[in-house]
Amino acid sequence: MHTGGETSACKPSSVRLAPSFSFHAAGLQMAAQMPHSHQYSDRRQPNISDQQVSALSYSDQIQQPLTNQVMPDIVMLQRRMPQTFRDPATAPLRKLSVDLIKTYKHINEVYYAKKKRRHQQGQGDDSSHKKERKVYNDGYDDDNYDYIVKNGEKWMDRYEIDSLIGKGSFGQVVKAYDRVEQEWVAIKIIKNKKAFLNQAQIEVRLLELMNKHDTEMKYYIVHLKRHFMFRNHLCLVFEMLSYNLYDLLRNTNFRGVSLNLTRKFAQQMCTALLFLATPELSIIHCDLKPENILLCNPKRSAIKIVDFGSSCQLGQRIYQYIQSRFYRSPEVLLGMPYDLAIDMWSLGCILVEMHTGEPLFSGANEVDQMNKIVEVLGIPPAHILDQAPKARKFFEKLPDGTWSLKKTKDGKREYKPPGTRKLHNILGVETGGPGGRRAGESGHTVADYLKFKDLILRMLDYDPKTRIQPYYALQHSFFKKTADEGTNTSNSVSTSPAMEQSQSSGTTSSTSSSSGGSSGTSNSGRARSDPTHQHRHSGGHFAAAVQAMDCETHSPQVRQQFPAPLGWSGTEAPTQVTVETHPVQETTFHVAPQQNALHHHHGNSSHHHHHHHHHHHHHGQQALGNRTRPRVYNSPTNSSSTQDSMEVGHSHHSMTSLSSSTTSSSTSSSSTGNQGNQAYQNRPVAANTLDFGQNGAMDVNLTVYSNPRQETGIAGHPTYQFSANTGPAHYMTEGHLTMRQGADREESPMTGVCVQQSPVASS
């Protein structure tokens, strides 16, 4: 220990010692009061002379390093302590708990304020604001790849854009006026994106193929007039149509349409499916639902199928997740291979919904959908579930080899035992129709309902191989001879004032002569969609509301008798069944004997085509100045990748198809009365049913009419070109549309009723 007079061995300038620990406590208190410094190295303690250091005890000197170490840590902690504290009202915990509603309101205010400001900037003329926004496709597109529609815009000196009428995942649909053809059209504008373009090109190819085989436009498929590229968007020009069957149901307050009108829709749909099943087409629609079936005229029952955006040809199936859920077939739910039979399942669901007003199977998800199907139809056959990849998603196999429904995970939904929710009761076969609303009405007898129920059950067969096919469905006894019926929903919409005001109106129609010419029209003011090709009519004026949308009549009065289909064996003569597909047109079919219904036919068989020419009476061009702009349809599609065409080279069953029109179709027997369909009703289903999966499609002889004005390219295909600067190539001209003739027609109370279009869903 050094004495007081001794000096330290170290240089005084190098010593920076703190006082003793007891003294430093006061020093810390003083340090806390001093202003904080950003550089701790600038904060120094007072210098201590060598004499003071020598006077310290040894124990105090030992504690000095510890004091030097503790002091910086405490000072650092003091510096980290906030000098001011947050207002408790603004704390996140409070905002997300006690003040949660207030927080959400503030978020909404900020969000909508920004949205409103952007909207105002978009409409303003200030160029400075427009420069701030990102430009897509030279300013023609929005950030969703959709074309920015401007009302009144003129495209290629031909199309005048009127308004946006529909929007979906595929793009948009606009109403436009074609100055060249002088008619209203619906233009489907595809998104400016490769995936949507590829899928739309498939739709174009299928529509061209169908229109090529249906030049008379009598198989209820929407007519694609032409297509072109405009500002990097593929545009499809369709004929003008009216609203869809879902809109019609909504107009009945979801009470459903009459059984007679349901029959009209059913027969047209079966004819369309028969057309799609021809071997040259073999097209699966894949998305049949009320929204995709459109009325040609709001006053009439003629319909057309639209939206082939998710369609494919047999053998080119690339998707497993298809069809809207309510109308999804069991084989699709179970992950099995599918064919054209899935569209027949969808049709069965649609027909029940059109009459009852409610979906038959309204599942919230796939499991719920299957459970609701089982409620009505029971457990699917074991041989189907044994082969289904997704069977155990819905069912479980018991030790004895049978299958039963799995219990739902949530346990909230309670279902009726399998097969106990009878279609008999859903349709109200013996109780006056659905909800008893049809009791006492003409055409709604128990016998009528029994025929309807039998047809629906055949359409809803679990096994796609034994599910009824369009050819046999058209021969079902449900399709009896009926007069034309408009979309009259007077018995269903008692609460609609607009409907009640229209119920008192009525019209009569003149019938055409037996020569096949169109000699008159109804005085209801129905006219062709082409204003330059008006038929002479006996009324005096045309109703402006439907002048641009009449597309119901496709063929004149013709009575056709087709030869018996090739491939029938045996000596028993086939039964002749006369099918009246038009009020003035009849077609005779040869129904196969029961035991020899259809056999595979190999080799080259000759096809017989019957051509009937139209004779029209014309007068001058109709003025367009006062034409009312009708509503048209929305047609959403599903995007998918491109598919290549594939020929179906399997053996087919040869038979003849209906020559049908958009008017009411009915089946009657020319030789056996009501027993004309006996050959079909008693046929052994399992033995004689066609297997679409193996044979491709039914070989149906369809009458094909050539179009002398159609330009063809290689292999007879229509020629067309894509151009962003020039007008579209006219590769598909309009087929002749004659005025539909018939007797005892009723003016529909739908006339003049503005029906709100259903929202477009992304399917």
UniProtKB/Swiss-Prot annotation:
Record's compositionally biased regions (Low complexity): 502-525, 654-672
Domain of life: Eukaryota
Chain positions covered by the region annotation Histidine-rich domain (HRD): 595-625
Entry-linked SMART domains: S_TKc
Family the UniProt entry places it in: Belongs to the protein kinase superfamily. CMGC Ser/Thr protein kinase family. MNB/DYRK subfamily.
Impact after mutating Y321F: Suppressed autophosphorylation on tyrosine and reduced tyrosine, threonine and serine kinase activity towards histones
Region Disordered: start-end pairs: 33-56, 115-136, 408-442, 485-540, 596-679, 744-763
Full protein name: Dual specificity tyrosine-phosphorylation-regulated kinase 1A
EC number per UniProt: 2.7.11.23, 2.7.12.1
InterPro entries given in the database record: Kinase-like_dom_sf (IPR011009), PKc_DYR1A/1B (IPR044131), Prot_kinase_dom (IPR000719), Protein_kinase_ATP_BS (IPR017441), Ser/Thr_kinase_AS (IPR008271), Ser_Thr_dual-spec_kinase (IPR050494)
Quaternary organization: Interacts with RAD54L2/ARIP4. Interacts with CRY2. Interacts with RANBP9. Interacts with WDR68. Interacts with SIRT1.
Modified residues (Phosphoserine): S14, S310, S529, S538, S748, S758
Cell compartment(s), UniProt: Nucleus speckle
